[in-house]
Curated annotation (Swiss-Prot):
Cofactor requirement: Fe(2+)
Keyword Heme in record: yes
Name under which the protein is recorded: Acyl-CoA desaturase
Cellular component, GO, one term: endoplasmic reticulum membrane
UniProt-annotated binding residues for Fe cation 2: 141, 246, 275, 279
Binding site for heme: 384, 410
Organism name: Ajellomyces capsulatus (Darling's disease fungus)
Motif window: Histidine box-2: 138-142
Biased composition (Basic and acidic residues): 22-35
Binding sites annotated in the UniProt record for Fe cation 1: 101, 106, 138, 142, 278
Membrane topology note: Multi-pass membrane protein
Amino acid sequence: MALNEAPTASPVAETAAGGKDVVTDAARRPNSEPKKVHITDTPITLANWHKHISWLNVTLIIAIPIYGLVQAYWVPLHLKTALWAVVYYFMTGLGITAGYHRLWAHCSYSATLPLKIYLAAVGGGAVEGSIRWWARGHRAHHRYTDTDKDPYSVRKGLLYSHIGWMVMKQNPKRIGRTEITDLNEDPVVVWQHRNYLKVVIFMGIVFPMLVSGLGWGDWFGGFIYAGILRIFFVQQATFCVNSLAHWLGDQPFDDRNSPRDHIVTALVTLGEGYHNFHHEFPSDYRNAIEWHQYDPTKWTIWIWKQLGLAYDLKQFRANEIEKGRVQQLQKKIDQRRAKLDWGIPLEQLPVIEWDDYVDQAKNGRGLIAIAGVVHDVTDFIKDHPGGKAMINSGIGKDATAMFNGGVYNHSNAAHNQLSTMRVGVIRGGCEVEIWKRAQKENKEVESVRDEYGNRIVRAGAQVTKIPEPITTADAA
């Protein structure tokens, strides 16, 4: 089997083939026959719709559970059987989350041979494919998230990412290739893959039925509740990681792709719901990093470590995690900032002579110059909190001192509002003009900008703000 390969469409079909490459006679004879078009490359019609469906998977994940639900109407649910079904649900569910996912798909920790055998067994009891098939497909999902090479891309629809990718046939050539050398060299993975059908039948149906049958005589109840229905709920929980975790919640670490964090998804999936974190830090054995977040898979792996069954638990440094969080917060702030009116950018303001500024002010235009920037306050005069007389006294003058403490040391909000009224820059060597000229000459000027190219104006860093407040007349 090639080291970098794409998953087959069906876990059972691949296992039935023994996991080996099959070279057909047609492949040995180049150009002997034209290539057959895969059914997924043809449109769905009334005549061929049934060919697009994976009937084996439909039987396993839809038809059999329906049979179980129907039988549950007549089969009484005993308390011991119910408790056993719940316990085995968690056992097989952790076989997927702690075993298939975090151990084999992401190598986020190492396990002793007994633990590997246990996880391979109970993971098989979840009836979600062999370790090799499952982990290979999941690696493709991470490598090609939200693209056509993602085997269960949410971009194809929420229903498709949940169950459609299983019940509809997929062209294996379109699924992204991944590195699986480590899986091919793991004897437990290889053994389970070769004997997968036996593992599924025994661990999925026979074992839970034996426990309830030999334990308290409820053979058929064990078959229906701890077997069929328990498999259905484990599968649906896992499918929620592919669908719900890419649709519901927040994106505190990155929003380039669809993965999201949400407590509801975590509750449904044994802690796999903090998916945005997981896609950013996939080799971390944790999905939840806060003490209050629900992640029983993480807690179980930690307990195994204390028992000597697991070791080399991988964790990203808190510093790197926090950097990602801060960068995403900054990105969200930039998005909000881009929607606000910060006034005409300084570099786009026209440079005007002082005499022109004075003349326009004398001719009835309410212009005020503060720190070399001209502001038109005509429409604001009547709303000025300090009264009309106060603001009128600064029209046509340099009101820098007046605005920054000479009369009143204006608030940060006042500086922000003032920035939306600026209309020009005074010529004459003032600081703002020097800054503006340097911009035109492409000289390096201290100016922090966000990802959209907008200048970031921090509180107290407005161009009209004088660092040291000027002493007021009363204080003098």
